[in-house]
Amino acid sequence: MSAILQGAGAATALSPFNSIDSNKLVAPSRSSLSVRSKRYIVAGSDSKSFGSSLVARRSEPLIPNAVTTKADTAASSTSSKPGHELLLFEALQEGLEEEMDRDPHVCVMGEDVGHYGGSYKVTKGLADKFGDLRVLDTPICENAFTGMGIGAAMTGLRPVIEGMNMGFLLLAFNQISNNCGMLHYTSGGQFTIPVVIRGPGGVGRQLGAEHSQRLESYFQSIPGIQMVACSTPYNAKGLMKAAIRSENPVILFEHVLLYNLKESIPDEEYICNLEEAEMVRPGEHITILTYSRMRYHVMQAAKTLVNKGYDPEVIDIRSLKPFDLYTIGNSVKKTHRVLIVEECMRTGGIGASLTAAINENFHDYLDAPVMCLSSQDVPTPYAGTLEEWTVVQPAQIVTAVEQLCQ
């Protein structure tokens, strides 16, 4: 991977089928694991030499004990100051605005990103502040304006390209694959492509098949591209800022049902590491790896699991490419069991790639096969009850953990 990469109003609330009230939902605080001494980003690395020390000896077959830790327990916030509350889409906007203030080379382009403010208001107010050249409304032609953004990056700008819906970016797949991802390599290093491609996706509230795409499975095979998925206002802003500053092309995945999440974020400047997972809930019995909206389904299931005597460790992987196998590996060495929960399709999804990486690097530390819960391999139905059936629900997560921990 390192040989290919160039350098190192609001939306709807959570699904009505999810019992979490998004208007009251406050994203948990964040913390990473210990300082990295070694990072695994290439499949096939020697898991025996992992890190500076082993985390735990192999466990005996798990017998659930009473667990008193709250299911939503997380490490303390990275900020010592009260900060200010923002919805997730507002956090994205704030991060983008700060980077445009900081660097005059940062620009925005896409459909209705100008005075309309974007389909989910992530670019609201930017055209008034920075003008119509730095916040450019484009024709409805994804292939054209994506190519324009890549060309602008080749000449020294740092474009942020918005897809009104991630599904529409299929029309720009040639530009994203053959140009965005590969030009640094095919030009012999003459060009860097510091482009951010972002937009809403995921299964929404009866948006139909074409507007419910999860394109991470499509883009993960493109060499030279990094992919991250935000899940809280804090990491949405931090990942946005980090992606803009990166010399690599970065795709930032945003979920349509998370735009209204509210969280207090620091007043001081911060960025998130593009290749770092987030420890959401420490635990001992099983590692649950997830990202984006499924983070909240997992945390809902964790409350039930705690009441049943299980102590799950929940990690939001955030970096979809490359995987943070340091954080993941430390957790696997401690719990010896892995459940992956994703909204991506099962066939060829992120979960399949993550399963392969874990088996190749940490097979000797597993006491049970890696299990992956994914969306059904069907077009997303419009009918609400059928739409619910296609994606992983908290009850399925509870059942899977019980099976793995027998």
From Swiss-Prot:
GO terms for cellular component: chloroplast envelope; endoplasmic reticulum. Its EC number is 1.2.4.1. Keywords: Chloroplast, Metal-binding, Oxidoreductase, Plastid, Potassium, Pyruvate, Thiamine pyrophosphate, Transit peptide. The keyword Ligase does not apply. It comes from the Eukaryota. K(+) binds at residues 195, 243-244, 248. Transmembrane segments: none annotated. Thiamine diphosphate binds at residue 142. Gene3D superfamilies: 3.40.50.920, 3.40.50.970. GO terms for biological process: pollen tube development. It is found in: Plastid, Chloroplast. It catalyses: N(6)-[(R)-lipoyl]-L-lysyl-[protein] + pyruvate + H(+) = N(6)-[(R)-S(8)-acetyldihydrolipoyl]-L-lysyl-[protein] + CO2. Residues 1-70 form a transit peptide. It is an enzyme of class 1 (oxidoreductase). InterPro entries: THDP-binding, Transketo_C/PFOR_II, Transketolase-like_Pyr-bd, Transketolase_C. One of its GO terms (molecular function) is zinc ion binding. Pfam families: Transket_pyr, Transketolase_C. Its cofactor is thiamine diphosphate. The pyruvate dehydrogenase complex catalyzes the overall conversion of pyruvate to acetyl-CoA and CO(2). It contains multiple copies of three enzymatic components: pyruvate dehydrogenase (E1), dihydrolipoamide acetyltransferase (E2) and lipoamide dehydrogenase (E3). NCBIfam families: PRK09212.1. Tetramer of 2 alpha and 2 beta subunits. This is Pyruvate dehydrogenase E1 component subunit beta-3, chloroplastic. The lineage of its organism: Eukaryota, Viridiplantae, Streptophyta, Embryophyta, Tracheophyta.
